[in-house]
């Protein structure tokens, strides 16, 4: 899985200001979640860090899905990166970190990367740029 957000016409400066502001929040939230991804943290910890960053900026009501899911034999499997999942994350686990902000009828955005936990953090399996194109 890999999700990036694009602006029709390719010029972020021409996107609505609320879109530009929300994308900056989304990128910061995803970066905070990636930084918190390490063995011993829980799936709920990663979700909470992501939601806190988005909610603090006023966009919390527009983040309507879990933060991520495991990548393995099934498309969606444990660890489900979501509130209430106290599963401790372990080295070698692969999962998505994919927060999104959606304003129905106006615009939506998601930023998704797959990470694999290492003994001291994570490795990102996606190499695509995270900026809006």
Report each predicted region and the residues it spans.
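Active-site neighborhoods and metal-handling regions in enzymes and metal-associated proteins
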Residues: 1-133
């Amino acid at each position: 899985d890999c999700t990036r957000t694009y602006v029709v016409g390719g010029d972020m400066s021409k996107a609505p200001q609320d879109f530009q502001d929300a994308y900056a929040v989304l990128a910061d939230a995803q970066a905070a979640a990636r930084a918190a991804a390490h063995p011993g943290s829980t799936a709920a910890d990663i979700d909470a860090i992501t939601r806190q960053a988005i909610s603090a900026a006023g966009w919390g009501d527009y983040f309507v899905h879990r933060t991520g899911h495991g990548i393995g034999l099934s498309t969606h499997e444990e660890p489900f990166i979501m509130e209430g999942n106290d599963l401790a994350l372990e080295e070698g686990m692969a999962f998505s970190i994919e927060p999104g902000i959606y304003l129905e009828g106006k615009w939506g955005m998601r930023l998704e990367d797959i990470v694999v936990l290492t003994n001291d953090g994570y490795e990102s399996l996606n190499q695509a740029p995270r900026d809006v194109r």
